[in-house]
Amino acid sequence: MLYNRLLLASNSKSMIEKGMKSMRRDYNTYLRQFHEAKWDEEIIFDLSVPGQRGILVPQPDEAIVEEVGNGVEDIPITMRRKKAPALPEVHQMRVNRHYMRLTQEVLGADITPDISQGTCTMKYSPKVQEHLVSQNPNLVDVHPLQDPSTMQGILEIYKKVEEMVCEISGMDAFNFHSGGGAAACYTGACVVRAYHESRGDTKRDEIITTIFSHPCDAGAPATAGYKVITLMPDENGVPSLDAMKAALSERTAAIFITNPEDTGIFNPRIKEYVDAAHAVGALCYYDQANVNGIMGITRAKETGFDIIHYNLHKTFSSPHGGMGPGCGALGVQEFLKPFLPVPRVEFNGKDYYLDYNCPQSIGKVREFMGNAHILVRVYMWIKQMGA
């Protein structure tokens, strides 16, 4: 037994060293050197062996069962399974080996960028989309300064994607210029300021957020010059309504909230927060970084939010890309539309055109109109989902 363990440790060290060597980066080209996997791994259901177990589900103590019951009896009969779920029966070592081999098989698919981290869930990015956006001359050969009459296709996609995400969110207008979620959050903070200033309400210099909201909900408004108030959770895991009301005042410009929060928990008090903020004249900003968990179940409009952003490079199946490229889609209710960045893509019944005639706009937030290829991926993915 001891010999086998030592042999396994020795082999593991050798395998790790070989793996490190195969993944060594060439700093002349900044590309990784890697070897292709020499196997074709089966799907995990084909590896199933009746009776194998990776873990043993812990059983409750008898005292707990006597106090609260076994739990199953409380589930309505109509909701109980008639037979056990068809899950693969695989021991722990085989599971580890299986997923390790899968990662090695896809190692060369996207070798150039590093894999970045995110607190929000990512979707799969179909390779058919990558082929189109990287090789189709109708996209890759378009220059943003050419005449709009010569790029009607991409302008139509801009407009169609806007209509789609408006329907999904309940918002009335979207802007796709921001290069990511935090950039959209900053743009949103600027829109909030422009709205209050248009009404002569210049004393509102505070933004309220929660500790488990996306970090940019505090960072972006602070960068825009706001004082940020961060609420902490109570014993239920979310800030109390009383804490929110105590923080709100005539100086509150908006609340910036992520929901579900970065803990993965949906905040059930969100509608109460929105109503309390509106009662003091503040706007409500919805960071939808974690919207995958509630997509198609509820919309920002029904909760009462005035302004939101989606991360198109996460929620709508465009690659996360290792810090870029991305697209932060900023959506607003109709009364905030005049403040969105320019230019806006509009349709006059015949042609798509760029509208710069927006006197209340906050102006441009970046060069040109954002990352157009992201919107092509989004358009394809939404269509593939049945839109």
Where do the language-model regions lie?
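N-terminal glycine-rich, Lys/His-bearing helix-loop that initiates the first secondary-structure elements
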Residues: L2-D141
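Gly-rich Lys/Arg/Thr-decorated short loops/hinges at beta-loop-alpha junctions or inter-strand turns
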Residues: M79-R80, Q135-P148, C166-S169, A222-M232, ...
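Short, hydrophobic/aliphatic alpha-helical segments
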Residues: V95-I111, V161-M171, Y310, Y353-Q360
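Flexible, glycine/charged-enriched surface loops at secondary-structure junctions
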Residues: D110-S116, D172-F176, Q288
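Phosphate-binding active sites in nucleotide-utilizing proteins
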Residues: L139-L145, S149, I154, A173-H177, ...
